[in-house]
Each structure stands twice: as structure tokens, then as C-alpha cells.
């Protein structure tokens, strides 16, 4: 499946204003349709410092019993324990635009560290 990371400044307003604020405190993957494009959003939840990262590594569709499940493989990076980071609450998020034509029936997040 093809996808591309979307720079935060180029995200549709629906994603930045509605979806990310609602889900940023959770650790999950979700998909949404905006202007006929399907986006996948991976959130890491609330973190106590800067330095936490999330990125989408790959995605596949699994079909079972007439249901399509989007499996999202995400890389989570934690800050180096030997490095000082800002003591500020952060919400790591990664948004990618996919080549999907419709929303999947379900989404499963598989995390890799």
C-alpha cells in the first residue's frame, strides 16, 4: 500500500482542528476521509517530555470474513535517557495520506520499538 507523510502545515483543517485534538491523548491508529482522500493518523498519547517520536513504517490490508482490517505498523522512539529534554507535555502524532479508495472496516495498530 502506498502512503506519504503529510507535513503538519499541509494537513486539512478537519484533521488539525477536530480529529487530532480529540484523539491525541490516546495511543491508537485511526483513519478518516477528507475531500475523497483517506488519511491514517497514529497517536502516542500524552508524554511528559519532548523527544518521543512516532512514524508509520508500513500498512497492509487483511481480509477475513468479508471484513477489511488495515494493519498499521508504527515505529515508536523514546528519548535517549542520557540526554536532557524539555519538561513539557507532548502528544506525538504522525499523519499519512494513503492510496486507499475507501475506509477499512477496522484498524489495528502494531507497534515496533
Name each region found by the language model.
Residues 1-113:
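Exposed, flexible binding/inhibitory loops of compact, secreted disulfide-stabilized domains
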Amino acid at each position: 500500500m502506498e502512503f506519504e507523510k503529510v507535513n503538519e502545515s499541509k494537513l486539512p483543517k478537519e484533521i488539525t482542528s477536530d480529529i487530532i485534538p480529540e484523539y491525541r491523548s490516546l495511543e491508537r491508529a485511526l483513519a478518516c476521509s477528507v475531500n475523497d482522500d483517506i488519511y491514517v493518523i497514529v497517536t502516542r498519547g500524552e508524554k511528559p517530555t519532548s523527544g518521543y517520536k512516532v512514524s508509520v513504517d508500513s500498512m497492509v490490508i487483511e481480509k477475513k470474513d468479508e471484513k477489511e482490517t488495515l494493519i498499521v505498523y508504527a515505529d515508536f522512539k523514546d528519548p535517549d535517557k542520557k540526554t536532557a529534554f524539555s519538561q513539557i507535555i507532548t502528544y506525538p502524532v504522525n499523519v499519512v495520506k494513503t492510496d486507499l479508495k475507501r475506509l477499512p472496516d477496522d484498524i489495528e495498530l502494531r507497534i515496533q520499538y
